[in-house]
Amino acid sequence: MATYFVGDIQGCLDELLLLLERVEFNREKDQLWLTGDLVARGPKSLETLRFVKSLGNAAITILGNHDLHLLAVSQGISRVKEKDKTAPIFTAPDSEDLLTWLRHQPLLAVHSEYDIVMTHAGISPQWDMPTAIECAHEVESVLLSDKWVWLLENMYENHPDTWDVTLSGIERYRYIINAFTRMRFCHLDGRLDMECKLPPQDINNDELVPWFELENRLPLSHKVIFGHWAALMGHEGNNVIALDTGCVWGEYMTMYRIDDGKYFTQKAIEQ
C-alpha cells in the first residue's frame, strides 16, 4: 500500500489523473490525500468532485477556502467568482449529493503512522497539536449541524486575528476557519495577517513572516503538509511540506509519496 499527498487540484482533474496513472495508483490498496481546494478556476471542478467522491475510503480530502466558498455560493451567501468555473456544479443532477459530501469533509486529517497532519493552509502558530485537533472538530461539528448556513454567512471577516482560549461563538469559529483555510503570513506577535499574498521573498519589512517561520511558534508533534500558498512552490523545511505548486496558474501539480519520500510533478495542461 502506498500513500500519496497532492496539492490543490482546483478543478485541474486531468493533471491529477496523469499523476495517478504514472504511479499506478490502485484504489483498492493505495490512499490519496488531498490538501483541499478541489474546486475553483480549473476547467473540471464538477468532475473533480465526482472523481474524489467516487474513490470512497481511498481518498482523504480536507476543506479549503474555495471549498467553503462553494458551499456558501450554494446557499446564496456568496456569488461565483468571475474566474471560477464552478457554475456547472449547481445545475448538475448530483449537485446536492456532491455538496453534502463536501460539507462532511474535515478541516484537518492526521496520518498517525507517519506523524503527519494535513490541513489546507497550515496550523496556527499559537496552537499545539491537541488544540488544533480540538478546534478542527469544533467547526466540523457546526458544519454538520443545523447551524452550518449561519456559520458560512458569518465566516467572511479577518478578525479576530489572534488566538485566545476564551474566544467563543462565531469569533472562535472564524479564527479557526481563517487559520486552517486562509492563513499565510503572521505578525511577529503571532497575529494572523489576512491581507498579504506576496511570495515570502518579496516581503520588504520585518513585520510579517510565513506562519511556519515564526520564532515563537508552538512546537508540533507532527509534520504539517498543506497547500493553499502556490507562491511557496513546494517549500520543505521548518517541519512542513507545502504542496500547492500552482497548477491552476500554469505551473505544475505536485504529488508526494510519503512511503519513500519521492516527488512526482505534472506540468499544467494548456486550456
From Swiss-Prot:
InterPro entries: ApaH, Calcineurin-like_PHP_ApaH, Metallo-depent_PP-like. It holds the Pfam family Metallophos. GO terms for molecular function: bis(5'-nucleosyl)-tetraphosphatase (symmetrical) activity. It catalyses: P(1),P(4)-bis(5'-adenosyl) tetraphosphate + H2O = 2 ADP + 2 H(+). It comes from the Bacteria. SUPFAM superfamilies: Metallo-dependent phosphatases. Gene3D superfamilies: 3.60.21.10. Keywords: Hydrolase. Belongs to the Ap4A hydrolase family. PANTHER family: CYTOCHROME C5, PTHR40942. This is Bis(5'-nucleosyl)-tetraphosphatase, symmetrical. It comes from Aliivibrio fischeri (strain MJ11) (Vibrio fischeri). The gene is apaH.
